[in-house]
A protein has these predicted regions:
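Glycine/tyrosine- and acidic-biased, solvent-exposed loop/turn segments at the edges of beta-strands
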Residues: 14-152
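Sec-dependent N-terminal signal peptides
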Residues: 4-13
Length: 152
């Protein structure tokens, strides 16, 4: 009896998990994605792939707009961008990488405004600059040369 309940729960959980929808199968009007032949904005997990089959983008939409974690990859499988969105706007941690795998930048966005510490790197991995923002306004900045020495 116990095994029967466990197996039933497993089938229920598997049945509830949805395969992400291919982004190319949705219609985009303005900045909102819709189901085909529908006026209803799409909500759910989405994915887009390169012709090679490699993931290009994974994310989720709520009422047709980016909502939650969005991840984008180069065709070679290296991550390009990882960031969070709310109602189609960047909201939370944003990270981007150079195509060689080195970080390009990392920081927090709040309603499309930079907030807190943002760090930027040269393609060689050396720190380029640190900027501190409050509500999108630059508060302080420190810069480095590509060799690691502080810029004057």
């Amino acid at each position: 009896m116990k095994n029967h309940i466990i197996i039933s729960l497993l089938f229920l959980l598997v049945g509830c998990s949805k395969t992400p929808t291919d982004l190319d199968t949705l219609n985009k009007r303005g900045d909102t994605y819709y189901k085909v032949n529908s006026e209803e904005p799409f909500s759910g997990s989405v994915i887009n792939k390169y012709e090679s089959g490699q993931n290009q983008m994974k994310g989720s939409l709520e009422n047709g707009k980016d909502d939650g974690l969005v991840t984008i990859w180069y065709e070679n499988g290296q991550m390009v961008i990882k960031g969070t969105y709310k109602d189609g706007k960047k909201d939370g941690l944003q990270i981007q990488w150079w195509d060689n795998g080195q970080k390009m930048y990392e920081g927090i966005d709040k309603d499309r405004k930079l907030d807190g510490l943002w760090t930027f790197w040269y393609e060689n991995g050396q720190k380029l600059k640190e900027e501190t923002y409050k509500d999108g306004e630059l508060i302080s900045k420190k810069e480095w040369n590509e060799d690691g020495s502080v810029k004057e």
